[in-house]
């Protein structure tokens, strides 16, 4: 008779995301994962595979949550400019702990993308998806006369992806809220 799981896989995966986010892939041990996830070694392997497979699942889970948040943000805000403003200024107001963790996907890029083709592919696809979300929002803004049609929506989308990645990297090094707000202000001026 098959044993029932004594843990909730979704909660365990969320715990794994937090461990990898805090420690990075290389500095995360299986013992730490098992403790934080509340799972036994065999249950971890049976449910998620090895450490690398779990890491990939954690990256995808984090990525999917970010994509959903961004889509929801642009669907709920009154204007595209308001959406970008909320995204950038909310990022500048994150706590010191949030800034020190940075972005899990950016950390994965710096830590592993040159050594792991599958992770590099996942990260490139993530960037393209975010650029697509931003470009769609920018095109809506152009269609409604909010943003000049003289600006290339795809180029602006790439600019905002790069701005966010830069803000995440800077915030991790130096929790200077005012500097991050200045960057957000300059970036938003590109929508004028």
Language-model segments: which ranges?
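Short, solvent-exposed amphipathic helices
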Residues: 61, 72, 118-129, 133
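Hydrophobic alpha-helical segments that form the core
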Residues: 101, 151-170, 183-190
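Short, basic, alpha-helical segments at the C-terminal edge of helix-turn-helix-like DNA-binding modules
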Residues: 60-66
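N-terminal intrinsically disordered/low-complexity leader segments
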Residues: 1-7
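Helix-turn-helix
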Residues: 11, 15, 19-53, 57
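Hydrophobic alpha-helical connector segments
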Residues: 57, 71-101, 153-157
């Amino acid at each position: 008779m098959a044993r029932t799981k004594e843990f909730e896989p979704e909660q365990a995966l969320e715990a794994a995301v937090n461990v990898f986010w805090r420690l990075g892939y290389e500095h995360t041990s299986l013992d730490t994962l098992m403790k934080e996830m509340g799972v036994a070694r065999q249950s971890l392997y049976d449910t998620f595979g090895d450490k690398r497979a779990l890491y990939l699942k954690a990256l995808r889970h984090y990525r999917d949550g970010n994509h959903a948040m961004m889509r929801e943000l642009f669907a709920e805000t009154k204007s595209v400019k308001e959406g970008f403003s909320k995204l950038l200024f909310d990022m500048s107001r994150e706590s010191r702990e949030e800034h020190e963790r940075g972005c899990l996907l950016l950390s994965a890029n710096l830590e592993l993308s040159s050594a792991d083709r599958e992770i590099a592919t996942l990260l490139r696809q993530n960037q393209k998806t975010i650029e697509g979300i931003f470009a769609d929002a920018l095109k809506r803004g152009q269609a409604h006369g909010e943003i000049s049609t003289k600006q290339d929506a795809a180029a602006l989308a790439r600019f905002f992806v790069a701005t966010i990645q830069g803000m995440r990297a800077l915030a991790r090094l130096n929790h200077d809220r005012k500097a991050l707000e200045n960057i957000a202000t300059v970036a938003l001026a590109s929508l004028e």
